[in-house]
Swiss-Prot record:
Record GO terms (molecular function): urease activity
Lineage: Bacteria, Pseudomonadati, Pseudomonadota, Gammaproteobacteria, Pseudomonadales
Record Gene3D superfamilies: Urease, beta subunit
Quaternary organization: Heterotrimer of UreA (gamma), UreB (beta) and UreC (alpha) subunits. Three heterotrimers associate to form the active enzyme.
EC number(s) stated in the UniProt entry for this protein: 3.5.1.5
Family of this protein: Belongs to the urease beta subunit family.
Cited PANTHER family: UREASE
One cellular-component annotation, GO: urease complex
InterPro entries the UniProt entry points to: Urease_beta-like, Urease_betasu_sf, Urease_subunit
Natural source organism: Pseudomonas paraeruginosa (strain DSM 24068 / PA7) (Pseudomonas aeruginosa (strain PA7))
Gene of this entry: ureB
Pfam families: Urease_beta (PF00699)
Known catalytic reactions: urea + 2 H2O + H(+) = hydrogencarbonate + 2 NH4(+)
Name used for this protein in its record: Urease subunit beta
Gene Ontology biological-process entries: urea catabolic process
Keywords: Cytoplasm, Hydrolase
Amino acid sequence: MIPGEYDIQPGDIELNAGRRTLALSVANTGDRPIQVGSHYHFFEVNDALAFDRPATRGMRLNIAAGTAVRFEPGQSREVELVELAGERRVYGFAGRVMGDL
């Protein structure tokens, strides 16, 4: 093997396999674009995003790490969320949870 060389196995990688997901419609009611990152606790996103907020407690976007979804002003789109894993404790973000889910 050459230093830095990748040995990639054939096949697909399935993200978040076996975790509960939720599909919902989200609308940007504001006048500015809003971008939400892959690991942001969706329950705590910008208040200008309109959706069933209580249903999203303990969930994040079901997209690849390091990516984001952008909502343009007036735009409505379907997104898929996935349950947070690990210890299921949330601190920071908008400060709406600050502890166990």
